[in-house]
From Swiss-Prot:
GO molecular function, one term: phosphoglycerate transmembrane transporter activity
PANTHER family to which the protein is assigned, alphabetical: SOLUTE CARRIER FAMILY 35 (PTHR11132)
Lumenal domain ranges by topology: 123-134, 234-277, 397-407
Membrane-spanning residues: 102-122, 135-155, 213-233, 278-297, 376-396
Membrane topology: Multi-pass membrane protein
Name this protein carries in UniProt: Triose phosphate/phosphate translocator, chloroplastic
First-listed, main subcellular location of the protein, grouped into a coarse class: plastid
Assigned protein family: Belongs to the TPT transporter family. TPT (TC 2.A.7.9) subfamily.
Transit pept. (range): 1-79
Lineage: Eukaryota, Viridiplantae, Streptophyta, Embryophyta, Tracheophyta
Compartments it resides in: Plastid, Chloroplast membrane
Species, as recorded: Brassica oleracea var. botrytis (Cauliflower)
This protein's record includes keyword Transmembrane helix: yes
GO CC aspect terms: chloroplast membrane
Length: 407
């Protein structure tokens, strides 16, 4: 029909007499063509949105049908059904958790706190009858690696491919992670859990120092001032800590330095891989890093009397069960911390991390009945308050930078 209309338009320009055809014949022919189109044409969308198209051509007869008053009532049910069908096809059904994302975030935070507290308590209980932190650190990573391999085998999540370039950037991160993990456990085994976490509250101070003096990134004076209470509080707590010894103190400080370098290398090792796969690969590499020191430092003692003493105290079943579950709790709480970070703003995660440390210190004191002096308690409180202040200020600065880039 289009070719006929174009032909008539051409003839109209070249020969005006063509217009003398009877009006009734033209109307009859047009109405016949119109009815033939409407017989097979089905409405696809609204006209205003470019709908009612077949092979890219808009069906004009429907416009004429729509313009007739007696036809409008006929078209209303059809349009309503079409709109309902379009809505149902265009929108996916949202589940209960999808409707309430804040509920998912809250559950993740609670699980993160719960698993972290359980890990620290169970970890310290193991050290009370099995004081071999190098070996226990290997068990933490080994159980996590097995968990990752099983998850990959069932496709939850799907394993991301890795190549030599990715390994080059992940290996430094994994080495720092391994050193920080082992030294943290050495400190946990040597002193009270609450004291180790108080020392580890200095980690932001090391991060700021590394950023300022190693990376050349200027740190605002407000951040430095917020770190003063942290240093003061840790110093007060250390001077009167009843479980203080230099091995626990120095190990916790080395852990802070190691995790600081891990943060530096992590910034340089940004990849397109998701966080779950990244943490899995880091755990695998860290496991191989931790194995040699564990064999060299604690291997002979373990074979001589370490395993036998532990089994004699708690039994084989409990010993193996404790090692398995402490490894599971370690891996899961770290994974949940990463997943929570992806769902919330940096400020929320920073405050959550501070509150987590408060929970761990508080529960460890209650569970183990650790006696602390008044000065140690005040110093710990000042240090935690300083970390909270630092975290809030830093998160706000990062948010302002992010908004400035997007503006």
């Amino acid at each position: 029909m289009e070719s006929r209309v174009l032909l008539r338009a051409t003839e109209t320009v070249t020969g005006v007499p063509q217009l003398r055809r009877p009006i009734r014949a033209i109307n009859r022919q047009f109405s016949t063509a119109s009815s033939s189109f409407t017989a097979f044409a089905k409405p696809i969308g609204s006209i205003g949105e470019g709908g009612n198209l077949i092979s890219g051509r808009q069906l004009r007869p429907l416009l004429l049908l729509d313009s007739l008053p007696e036809k409008r009532e006929i078209l209303k049910p059809v349009r309503a059904a079409s709109a309902e069908g379009g809505d149902s096809a265009g929108e996916t059904k949202v589940g209960f958790l999808g409707k309430y994302p804040w509920l998912v975030t809250g559950i993740l935070l609670l699980m993160w706190y719960f698993l972290n507290v359980i890990f620290n308590i169970l970890n310290k209980k193991i050290y009370n009858y099995f004081p071999y932190p190098y070996f226990v650190s290997v068990i933490h990573l080994f159980v996590g690696v097995v968990y990752c391999l099983v998850s990959w085998s069932v496709g939850l999540p799907k394993r991301a491919p890795v190549n030599s370039d990715i390994l080059k950037v992940l290996i430094p991160v994994a080495v720092c992670h391994a050193i920080g993990h082992v030294t943290s456990n050495v400190s946990f085994a040597a002193v009270a859990v609450s004291f180790t976490h108080t020392i580890k509250a200095l980690e932001p101070f090391f991060n700021a120092s590394a950023s300022q003096f190693l990376l050349g990134q200027p740190i605002p004076i407000t951040l430095w001032l917020s770190l003063a209470p942290v240093v003061l509080g840790v110093a007060m707590a250390s001077l009167t800590e009843l479980s203080f010894n230099w091995l626990g103190f120095i190990s916790a400080m080395i852990s802070n330095i190691s995790f600081t370098y891990r943060s530096i290398f992590s910034k340089k090792a940004m990849t397109d891989m998701d966080s779950t796969n990244v943490y899995a690969y880091i755990s695998i590499i860290a496991l191989f890093v931790c194995l040699p020191p564990a064999i060299i430092v604690e291997g002979p003692q373990l074979l001589k009397h370490g395993f036998n003493d532990a089994i004699a105290k708690v039994g084989m079943t409990k010993f193996i069960s404790d090692l398995f579950w402490v490894g599971m709790f370690y891996h899961l709480y770290n994974q949940l911390a990463t997943n929570t970070l992806e769902r919330v703003a940096p400020l929320t995660h920073a405050v959550g991390n501070v509150l987590k440390r408060v929970f761990v210190i508080g529960f460890s004191i209650v569970i183990f009945g650790n006696k602390i002096s008044t000065q140690t308690g005040i110093g710990t409180g000042i240090a935690i308050a300083g970390v909270a202040l630092y975290s809030v200020i830093k998160a706000k600065i990062e948010e302002e930078k992010r908004q400035g880039k997007t503006a």
